Amino acid sequence: MFLGQYFEIFDWFIIYFTENNGMAFGLELGGELGKLILTLTRIFIVVFAIRYLFKLNLSKYKRPVLVCFGLILGGAIGNIVDCLLYGVLFNDSYNNIASLFPEEGGYSSMFFGKVVDMFYFPFFSTEIPSWVPYFGGNNFTFFKPVFNFADSCISVGAISLILFFRRDLNSVSYTHLRAHETSNH
């Protein structure tokens, strides 16, 4: 597919090929330094989270909680892999279809690749009434962001942890903290 090309599965489900240089909703830190900082920060957070999970006694967590952690970490690692490798392995998608292992090399170096997003769910569109300050008269589409499977994993895992397992996390974390404090004295 060409960058920006799309096809409809249903009116409310579109496969839309785009590349995201930043993070959620296309937010960027700006420039090459910003991209490098973003990629290194993602790697640091994932490594820290994995190390923290290994320090915990995971047997105290229910299996669904561990699945949520797995979704979050798996999604984060998937997006990191895109940032690290996509630009090295593929050529530019502007005005042509990206090819794997192009003779001239990829469009960027390690750490500077873009994340591929493709899922678009414009469930409904409406015009905001003109009397609404600032936004009045503008078109509003719900749900406008284009995202990928890794983003979905992160979102589902995080929302599930917050909605369904908040008490479990608080009690196990508190128990872990108390055990750690006791062992240090």
Feature names for model-found ranges:
Residues 1-178:
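Alpha-helical transmembrane bundles and membrane-interface segments of multipass inner-membrane proteins
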